[in-house]
Amino acid sequence: MGLLDIAALNRAAAELHAENPSVILYGEGWTGGSCPLPEELRAMKKNARELPDFAMFSDDLRDGVKGSVFYDTDCGYVNGKAAERAELIKSVMSGGIWREDVGRASAECWTDKPQQSVNYVEAHDNLTLYDKLRSSMPEASGAEIIAADKLAAAIVFLSQGVPFIQAGQEILRSKTAPDGSFVHDSYNSPDSVNSIKWNDVTLRRGVMEYYRGLIAVRKFFPQFRMRDAESIRKIRFETLEGGAVAADFGGLLLIVNPAAHPLRYENGRRMMVYADHITAGIRPLFIADGAVSVAPRGIILAEYR
């Protein structure tokens, strides 16, 4: 998008919405290289407030959750840098909206509308999420990598903004070359690399069902689909041990634990749990009285009274 100017894209949006008000417009809010346009004219993420009809991919959430896409072994919130990314995670869970109670500069918070933030950790380019986690967690077990994958997905689906996943992400899609290396940008790779391995639907059914459950949770609880900054700023965040984060929506509590050890959370309330590290959905899993244990690299989503 950044190779085009703001005025041109705003004109395009107006004409498209005149034809069909339901058209959704989104793109990559960067230039992808050099650009002759002055920065203030570029249709890019830093100028998103001047492009109110366009959503843009949140590389803040992407790299904050899993580490930089430009360095295979770099880690993010779910795979090794929990404490130092906790404030960023609270910010992206707020849809990138600036908040006084979150330690992130207002200049880095690029939108006032959660609808503009496309939240993702995997797309067509760069390593798949599963391959990125395997590259950055070389000592981790298979179960630990899957837990990190599911935690990353939970952040995508339960953050304010627009969730986005890549085809096959829900079955731990990998793009593996014949030599065993992971392919970053597979636009010129053969079908053996790019094809979805449908046997993984069976092999990874537990992960797929977790993604399905997260989608159901997002649809069921309007607290994850807020439409304005004023509402989002009412979410109460608490930073916990090891960079864990609790988000209190008033009657609904989300706890995110990125650490490699369990976390005990006490609020003295009766909690009806809808999601943990194994299952997510709209039917209660169990009731906790006063306290709940959050598994390593897991979540707890609970209504409380």
What do these predicted ranges mean?
Residues 2-5, 85-90, 134, 225, ...:
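A generic short-segment signal for beta-strand/edge and adjacent turn/coil regions
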Residues 145-146, 157, 162-165, 169-171, ...:
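Carbohydrate-interacting/catalytic domains
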